């Protein structure tokens, strides 16, 4: 597990708030970082670094994503098979279909209830930040 999983999430509901958060953590806000923030806030689904990069250098995008993750703005997650993806931490947990790969964000209230159930059953304070809750979507469940 990465050390970023232990980082407290930074609440930033806009690019401007994210810029302020980066500066508050002593990070410079360069034009490539601002462009990357714009892409993250525009994305409705978690994105690969390659998709976020566009015409930018992918290695630079990875370095900037690591910086964003270190201050709690972004998280790296795996949604089933395929490359890792990045999403804003405040966008919550995800569920993914093991058969077709479709994924959806989970409502915060549902995740809170799930965490309580896991804690009651096991004593474990479960986190759903890095991996999705896996299952079959309705279409794939009908096929299998």
Q: Model-found features: residue ranges?
A:
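Long C-terminal interaction/binding lobes of large macromolecular proteins
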Residues: 3, 40-41, 54
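Short alpha-helical segments that sit at the start of domains
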Residues: 3-35
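Short helix-capping/hinge SLiMs at alpha-helix to coil transitions
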Residues: 25-27, 41-44
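Positively charged, polyanion-binding regions of nucleic-acid-associated proteins
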Residues: 33-43
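Short acidic, hydrophobic short linear motifs in intrinsically disordered regions
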Residues: 46-53
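Short coil turns linking two alpha-helices in DNA-binding domains
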Residues: 57-58
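Basic amphipathic alpha-helical segments that dock to polyanions
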Residues: 61-72
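Non-DNA-binding regulatory cores of transcription-related proteins
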Residues: 71-144
């Amino acid at each position: 597990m990465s050390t970023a999983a232990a980082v407290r999430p930074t609440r930033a509901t806009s690019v401007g708030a994210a810029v302020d958060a980066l500066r508050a953590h002593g990070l410079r806000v360069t034009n490539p970082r601002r462009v990357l923030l714009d892409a993250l806030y525009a994305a409705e689904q978690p994105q690969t670094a390659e998709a976020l990069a566009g015409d930018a250098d992918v290695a630079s995008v990875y370095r900037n994503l690591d910086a964003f993750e270190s201050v709690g703005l972004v998280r790296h997650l795996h949604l089933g098979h395929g490359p890792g993806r990045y999403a804003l931490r405040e966008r919550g947990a995800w569920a993914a279909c093991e058969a077709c790969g479709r994924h959806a964000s989970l409502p915060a209230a549902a995740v809170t209830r799930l965490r309580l159930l896991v804690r009651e059953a096991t004593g474990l304070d479960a986190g759903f930040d890095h991996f999705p809750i896996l299952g079959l979507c309705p279409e794939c469940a009908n096929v299998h």
